[in-house]
Curated annotation (Swiss-Prot):
Binding site for Na(+): G75, T78
Membrane topology: Multi-pass membrane protein
Protein species of origin: Sorangium cellulosum (strain So ce56)
Name of the protein in its database record: Fluoride-specific ion channel FluC
Gene: fluC
GO MF assignments: fluoride channel activity; metal ion binding
Amino acid sequence: MERWFWIGLGGAAGTLARYGLSTWCQQRFGAEFPYGTLAVNVIGSFLLGAIGEIAATTELLSPTLRLSLSTGVMGGFTTYSSFNNETIRLIEYKSWAAGLANIAITLVVCLLAGVLGMVVARRLIAG
């Protein structure tokens, strides 16, 4: 039951952080393109890559902390459903090019961010 609590608390923190960053991005860059969702997914991919690498190669994270950070915080922070909804809206109301650009940018940049997170974690662990 304790793990559920920490996952839920992490999820709440991640959701609030996502809302804050998405709102800031929309105010800063406008609402013509889903910059906020792209930002949270790229940052979340990087952090999840780092968390996964640290959990796999060290004993720095207890199983409960790992779940709280990965499933909780990163699960609440990142958002695949918003990515889907915003991409559909771009295609439906703006242009196919904007929707396809969102798909390509999100997939490529998030994968690269995840790998970069793993590499950075490895280097930090190695000293």
